[in-house]
């Protein structure tokens, strides 16, 4: 059994179950209540799984085979569906540059989006995509090794991770402080923030007026 789900993109239109708006009827999915998963007919990159991120958290109207209907918030059944796991090893080569070996495992929406960009995008700049997947934001980095595992759109295993392995080198993340240091002990500053990327502070001392919206 399945149910027809009609909703809208939450980034453009919030579905209001109490006020009819034809713009609410923009996205069509099929919901499988027994397994709590969705089929998205108009997105090639999706298979049977969680609802796409652009409708999560929005309201929708669910219609069953008897034409009975109900309104409900679209939720993610598996709270650990979308993750990014990183393993990073840093080696300082003669204290002149850092060699960064990294393995990244993307699951859920992260994996789906990366596969779609790699396989379906007509405007993809391969160099920009490679930069994005190999610690973007580091000035003057050199990519020594770069490989992707499980990159095809079709994956025989549910929520198979999209894995990126890379080795890069960069001088910009290692700063020599010995020029101004009069002590005999040599000191260096390693810019860890550039390696792990920009972090967002989601907490606040004041009560939020609107909920956090993450894209």
What are these regions (language model features)?
Residues 2-215:
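A sensor for short, sequence-defined functional sites
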């Amino acid at each position: 059994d399945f149910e027809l789900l009609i909703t809208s993109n939450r980034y453009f239109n919030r579905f209001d179950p109490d006020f009819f708006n034809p713009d609410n009827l923009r996205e069509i999915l099929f919901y499988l209540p027994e397994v709590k998963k969705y089929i998205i007919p108009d997105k090639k990159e999706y298979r049977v799984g969680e609802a796409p991120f652009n409708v999560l958290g929005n309201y929708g109207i669910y219609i069953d085979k008897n034409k009975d209907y109900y309104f409900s918030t679209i939720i993610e059944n598996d709270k650990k569906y979308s993750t990014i796991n990183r393993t990073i090893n840093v080696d300082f080569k003669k204290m002149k540059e850092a060699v960064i070996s990294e393995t990244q495992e993307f699951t859920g929406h992260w994996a789906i989006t990366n596969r779609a960009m790699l396989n379906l995008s007509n405007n993809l700049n391969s160099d920009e995509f490679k930069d994005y997947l190999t610690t973007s934001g580091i000035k003057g980095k050199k990519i020594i090794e770069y490989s992707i595992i499980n990159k095809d759109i079709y994956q025989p295993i549910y929520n198979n991770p999209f894995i990126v392995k890379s080795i890069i080198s960069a001088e910009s993340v290692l700063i020599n402080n010995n020029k101004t240091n009069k002590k005999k002990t040599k000191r260096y500053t390693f810019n860890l923030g550039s390696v792990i990327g920009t972090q967002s502070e989601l907490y606040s001392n004041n009560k939020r007026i609107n909920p956090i919206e993450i894209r």
